């Protein structure tokens, strides 16, 4: 599969953009486990054109993450075009690698974004959505992609027709999450309409399916049943970035990968922590790692007290000591028989 000139190989598995999750350290971790392409957190168009430091910082990437997409969102057409131009030149503005793809967020359902007419709020204004997309495609050099949903609600699932219109603007790929905005993340994702987009003989750009890919078998089923060109993994990667390895292993061999041992998880947590503190400093790096540390050891028996200590430890040294303790106490946990299979 290609996005523009970017060859992602056969059946690529992508990391979805997620606010407060897909920062640089997590993106590097997911790449290490086999993600074929990763995306930044959501970058607000109004923040970029105001020269807001936080928005600009979200565009800083590294060669270790490539290929990478910068995802922008907003409702104002002029601001979105200007933000796209800035993303197009992110290497000069924010430093680092820059971006390989500019992705437009027409899918986020949270109220603070959709309620302002951005993200999946744009599903109520498909003409404006198409106009913004076309204007961005014409304004930048990098390939442009779109991520969106089935529609605003159950009565307005417009994605099959809208996919054609978006393709006609010149985008190079389309990602569709199998829920409406009003569903948020409730219930199960419905991939039926994603499959119908692929069945449309007029569609020629890659279609990337998203929604509830929380196991290697579900990933395989998505490719087999709905014929998508690629899948995008979101929430299931949080606390479980090795899901990319698990998916690739099933796709390539037909067999389940060996489980991630406690010792491997400890090694991963230490590496991830070192990345986070190196990129964000010892204070912020530890604070923002806590959400990941809390999830890396799900399923361990009698772990509650240690989890509390893990997410409140104020220094990297104390976190490291707790991780060593986890390895000593739970390293032979029968839920995780194997060790060091991931080469960490």
PLM region descriptions:
Residues 13-16, 38-40, 68-72, 102-104, ...:
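Hydrophobic faces of well-ordered beta-strands that scaffold small-molecule active sites
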Residues 1-4, 9, 18-94:
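Glycine-rich, positively charged N-terminal anion/phosphate-binding segment
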Residues 18, 80, 106, 122-123, ...:
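Methionine-biased hydrophobic packing positions in alpha-helices, especially
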């Amino acid at each position: 599969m290609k996005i523009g000139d970017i060859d992602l190989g056969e059946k690529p598995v992508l990391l979805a953009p997620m606010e407060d999750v897909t920062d640089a350290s997590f993106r590097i971790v997911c790449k290490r486990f086999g993600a074929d392409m990763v995306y930044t957190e959501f970058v607000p168009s109004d923040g970029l054109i105001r020269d807001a430091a936080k928005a600009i910082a979200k565009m800083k990437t590294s060669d270790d993450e490539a290929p990478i997409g910068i995802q922008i969102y907003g409702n104002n057409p002029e601001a979105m075009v200007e933000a796209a131009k800035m993303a197009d030149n992110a290497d000069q503005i924010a430093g680092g690698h820059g971006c390989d793809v500019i992705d437009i967020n027409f899918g986020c359902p949270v109220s603070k974004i959709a309620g302002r007419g951005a993200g999946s709020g744009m599903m109520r204004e498909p003409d404006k959505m198409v106009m913004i997309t076309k204007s961005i495609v014409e304004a930048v050099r990098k390939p442009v992609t779109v991520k969106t949903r089935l529609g605003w609600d159950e009565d307005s699932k417009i994605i099959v027709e809208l996919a054609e219109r978006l393709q006609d603007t010149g985008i190079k790929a389309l990602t569709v999450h199998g829920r409406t905005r009003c569903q948020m993340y409730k219930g199960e994702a419905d991939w039926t309409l994603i499959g119908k987009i692929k069945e449309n003989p007029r569609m020629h750009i890659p279609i990337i399916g998203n929604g509830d890919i929380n196991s290697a078998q579900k990933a395989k089923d998505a490719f087999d049943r709905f014929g998508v060109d690629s899948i995008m993994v979101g929430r299931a990667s949080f606390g479980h970035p090795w899901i990319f390895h698990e998916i690739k292993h099933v796709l390539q061999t037909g067999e389940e990968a060996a489980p991630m041992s406690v010792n491997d998880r400890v090694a991963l947590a230490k590496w991830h922590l070192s990345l986070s503190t190196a990129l964000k400093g010892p204070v912020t790096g530890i604070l923002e790692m806590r959400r990941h540390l809390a999830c890396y050891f799900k399923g361990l028996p009698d772990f509650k007290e240690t989890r509390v200590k893990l997410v409140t430890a104020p220094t990297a040294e104390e976190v490291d000591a707790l991780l060593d303790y986890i390895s000593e106490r739970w390293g032979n946990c029968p839920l995780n028989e194997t060790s060091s299979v991931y080469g960490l």
